[in-house]
Amino acid sequence: MSAPGSLGDFCRYALDYEEGRYADDPVRLGGLFREYAGINRTPNIKRTVDLVRSLGIKIEAVPYLDTGGTNMMARGSWHIHYAAKDRPATQKFDIFHELFEVIHKNLNSFNPDCNLVREPYLSRYADRFAAATLIPPSFFLNQVGVTGCDMVKLGEDLELSHQCLLIAVGQHFVDIPFIGVLYEYRPDGAISENKKIEDFVATVVVKTGRARRIKELCGLQTVPARNSHPQIGSLVCAAVTGGRPVLWRSTHIEDSPAILVRPLLSVGREPYRVILLAVPNEESGMISSQVERIEPIPANGDVSCPSEKRCQNSDGCIWKVVGGYDEH
């Protein structure tokens, strides 16, 4: 990774490159910045901070933020603050998220024709830029193939957040109908010993272009909207209740995808996050090595819920207690 020029130099470069056509596209802009800065593989946190400083931006890990980051202009200089408490994987993503916002504002100041994007789109654009910058395509595609699209292993090996990785998969596998969802445990009230399925929230929903219109993956699992809760009796519900990964494969339902639902467990063996991946059956090889490694419970709609004995949500459950596929 080489040291780039100043922030202004990059903005002028982005506006001149192919007549500025990349300036309004966060993924292409991220790729352009990656090439400009010479990022050939995912940088560690030190290199990330050094890169931002080399642009003339003052960057600092601060204790006043519980998580995330922020940016501001003060005394003629841009500043980026990020939470000192966060893990490096999260910090890197947040830093590049904030960097996009700084670049975006500067592009507008250089060229008012570059319209400023407002929330909630600004945050989504910034996330896409961060993922595109942090993950060089050829390097990432090789890593995805080796791990079987394992977000956990990729996160550990590349020091990247699961959010960043899911977004990157969606950006790099545009030719297949891929869907990825990240659920987080976010209870409204006091944290209870028995976690309820309605306390999980879909914080990240990634769809490639060919999956945009898909609303239901199978009779037991819909594609959630962002900030929605899992259904009682869904594949996510079964994975959370049982604390084990679940793999849906059906041979008698046409065009049924392979759906891998993986709960991540805390030290106390309680689910705190769930990762859902859905790929076409004919593309299931892209998750096969992960499946072999984590050994999920198979499900195909012909049997009762694998977590039935631990279920506390039998009322309104969409999974037939006696087994069988409940077609909606």
Residue ranges and their predicted role:
Residues 1-328:
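Active-site hotspot residues in diverse enzymes, especially metal/ion-binding acidic/histidine motifs
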